Amino acid sequence: MSDKWSPNSWRNKNALHMPNYQNEDHLNKTLNEISKYPPLVFAGEARLLKKKLGEVSNGNAFLLQGGDCAESFADFHPDNIRDTFKVILQMAVVLTFGASCPIVKVGRIAGQFAKPRSSATEVINDLELESYKGDIINGIDFNQKDRDPNPDRLIQAYNQSASTLNLLRAFSQGGFANLNKIHQWNLNFVKGENAAKFREISSRIDECLSFMEACGINGNSVRQLNETDFFTSHEALLLQYEEALTRIDSTSGKWYDVSAHMLWVGDRTRQLDGAHIEFLRGIENPIGIKVGPSTKTEELLKILDVLNPNNEAGKITLICRMGHEKVSGILPKIIRSVNSAGKNVVWTCDPMHGNAIKSNTGFKTRPLKDIISEIQQFFQIHRSEGTYPGGVHLEMTGQDVTECMGGLQEITDEDLKNRYHTYCDPRLNASQSLELAFLLSDFLKEEKLLSKQSSNL
């Protein structure tokens, strides 16, 4: 791979899962306009996230990454942003207690608009149109006008991302993230009849907060109890958009993609000689790599060399998405290869993408029991390999949807139709996300206990 890189050098490579725009002049005019827009995030924030992820890779923190499968223009509303942010905060408090370490909070938000599809086109009643590829590219309604890729959508996506980030910054720094307030939300959750098993953890958190308050440690005296750091991420799929938002940082002289703090490359676009790897190798942002059953270990090691030539801690997060039936047969070999090569990475579990099934009623869904099973195996495998399970990557929402089966609400196949609102893949609802956080808290506590015991031997 040539060492010469620029924000547009990806254009010389094979770019998979990219839309074909009919009017190139319209596209170029739009991209030129976006290239003059202010950055959505700042380079210093991306550096801070990389530093925090470095702590994760060293086993001193845990990554919670979650949000929508694909953001939509139609669902853009401050309440939806608030509810997703709220449930991530609630999960983080529970996980902090279990892990006894900081939780790095990263949202799939403020830019997660593009989705790769298995088929470039879709056929209904003998009419063949472009597949829906996310609101930044085309519309979900099955008609020619909606399905044709439209450059104007890039500007709408930028504007929505800017508004979302503005609200997230206000929430994270303006008192909404107060620790006592978040804990009160969790207390309300465990009051539910089916959530009794989580009350012990919640009561112990309550005792800790009461003790801190008695010592004069509260949101008024300690900023960290009233505010939080929250970062954004999305898949770097639509490279024209990413290129337009790639800028030189004035303080370091290095290139950053200012569309998000963290970008990731998907399972379908991580070809070593492809356009997406070419683009990502030149930016300083933290980068995620989706690792699935099709991953060839030798190629993954070469990708790590390309994307992180200095083996920098916090630069690379490997997002493992195997499926609960395959993870035990695939992940150990990958861990051993990466570990023996001495690569600094954050290991996270994406228990969503490998566990989708088609229900008897025809809905694409994900059983919560399968999601939990993959996470459990992920932890067990890392324990066996002597490596650190550094995080989870979830498709979730703060809304009360019925898209994934199971959980305390006991959502069944028949219930899916009630509030199945996703534009793409099924998401955990707020209750299922919190339930998962309480279970994860137990896993993390056990992990810390075993780690302490082994260090004392």
Question: Each predicted region: which residue ranges?
Answer:
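Glycine-rich, charged/polar anion/phosphate-binding loops
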Residues: 48-50, 273-276, 303, 332-334
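Active-site-facing alpha/beta catalytic cores
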Residues: 71, 76-323, 366, 374, ...
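Basic/polar N-terminal segments that are highly enriched at the extreme N-terminus
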Residues: 1-4, 450-457
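N-terminal basic/disordered segments at the start of proteins
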Residues: 1-63
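Short loop/turn segments at strand-loop or loop-helix junctions that form parts
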Residues: 64-69, 106-109, 349-352, 395-397
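Short N-terminal secondary-structure initiator segments
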Residues: 2-11, 49-80, 292-305
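Non-transmembrane, aqueous-exposed alpha-helical and coiled segments at domain scale
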Residues: 300-310, 315-347, 353-403, 408
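A general structural signal for short secondary-structure junctions and capping/turn motifs
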Residues: 53-56, 94-96, 279-280, 381-385
